[in-house]
Amino acid sequence: MTEPATAGHDYIVPVGTPLHRVHRDRPGAIAWFDTSEHGRFNLTDVTDRGTCYLALDPLGAYIETLGRILTRSRDDINARRHSTVAVDRDLRLFDLTRSEARAAYRSAGLDHTATIRAGDDYEAPQRLARLFHDDDYDGILYTARHDPGHAHRSIALFGRAGPNDTDVVFDSCETDTIGNDLIDAGRATFGIAVLAYPISEHANDEGSSRWRSDAGVG
């Protein structure tokens, strides 16, 4: 993957850049800005502000959403969609993938450790999200948690909390089913198997260690 130019802590996503999101096939899911405690960079204590998770490429969105469980049923895949969106302005993101980001960790009283990107305790990354939001960043660029090769980049985009009209948040949006090319790439690169038959409730339990990837929970 080509690394776009980054100045200091800033990572600029130019207007019109295609971004990718894998999400449930339900109303409001494309431009959903989460406020719960269950999102790594959610703005849990900022009134009326939430976080929408995207990626710079389709496989990055696929692995970030589905990489926790390495065996999926076809029904599970069919219940999801792949959306390609673009924004009508440049996005200024804080780039957590750069070593220079350590200063930001220290200013928030945090250690520069992989737990920010991949740990199960979300308190620290949520504190960082609040810090960057208050510094007028549009969001955060980080390494996809479930990618052991650290090749794919994810985006935590800040915006109005809850479901939003897609055409208000994004300049363009195309949504389709998850194609076989993406499924094949997920299997070849990350070992995510998609089975034609249903998986038992226990096997598809996201809390079951048997079906979790080594990278953990995203």
Model-found features: residue ranges?
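Extended catalytic/binding region for NAD+/ADP-ribose chemistry, centered on the ART fold
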Residues: 41-73
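Active-site and NAD+-binding cores of ADP-ribose-processing enzymes
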Residues: 1-36, 71-218
